[in-house]
Regions:
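Charged, solvent-exposed alpha-helical segments that act as regulatory interaction surfaces
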Residues: 6, 33-34, 87-91, 151-155
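C-terminal peripheral helix-coil segments that are non-catalytic and often amphipathic
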Residues: 63, 91-156
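Amphipathic alpha-helical interaction elements
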Residues: 9, 26, 63-67, 130
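Short, basic, alpha-helical segments at the C-terminal edge of helix-turn-helix-like DNA-binding modules
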Residues: 1-2
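A general structural signal for well-ordered secondary-structure junctions
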Residues: 34, 67, 84, 119-120
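A contiguous pocket-lining binding segment that forms or flanks enzyme active sites
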Residues: 54-92, 96, 103-108
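Hydrophobic alpha-helical connector segments
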Residues: 5-54, 71, 75
Length: 156
């Protein structure tokens, strides 16, 4: 956590929030095992290094105009998105059984469903899901979150 360096404010909460999210993703990506450690954490984070990034993020959201309750909830939403995205990038959400017999059976079942036309929407999206760069996906999600905060505040 001490490696997280909150980016300097640019005076635009949209960019400040996105830059902080990018930095958090970068830091988490540098340490693949930190996600497991965080998931196993049984007590609240209370060290100065662990709470400063939280304080900074909530400050950005308060600066956007959110009241303290909405800022806290938005903090959890942004955090869940960033950590979930990093877990997905690291393959933690897919499972560790790649190549084993059960996983190969699941892939075969999935291929049959696609071939049979049972998943028309997913089939249509598969090329995009497969080829979309991680950075592009991450930025798309950040844009949705930032626009959601603006919507909550009655801005377009």
């Amino acid at each position: 956590m001490s490696e997280f360096d909150p980016p300097a404010s640019r005076g635009d909460w949209h960019e400040d929030a996105k830059n902080a999210a990018r930095e958090w993703r970068r830091m988490l990506s540098l340490h693949p095992h930190v996600m497991t450690l965080m998931a196993e954490q049984r007590k609240p984070l209370t060290t100065p290094d662990s709470v400063r990034p939280m304080d900074s993020a909530i400050g950005v959201l308060r600066g956007a105009g959110l009241d303290v309750r909405d800022a806290a909830q938005a903090f959890h939403t942004f955090g869940g998105y960033i950590m979930g995205f990093v877990m997905m990038e690291q393959g933690m959400m897919i499972g560790h059984g790649e190549g084993d017999e059960a996983h190969l059976r699941e892939l075969a079942d999935f291929a049959q469903m696609v071939a049979a036309g049972e998943l028309p929407h997913l089939t249509e999206a598969l090329p995009i899901l497969h080829d979309c760069a991680a950075d592009e996906q991450f930025e798309f999600g950040l844009d949705l979150l930032v626009r959601g905060v603006d919507s909550k505040l009655g801005r377009s």
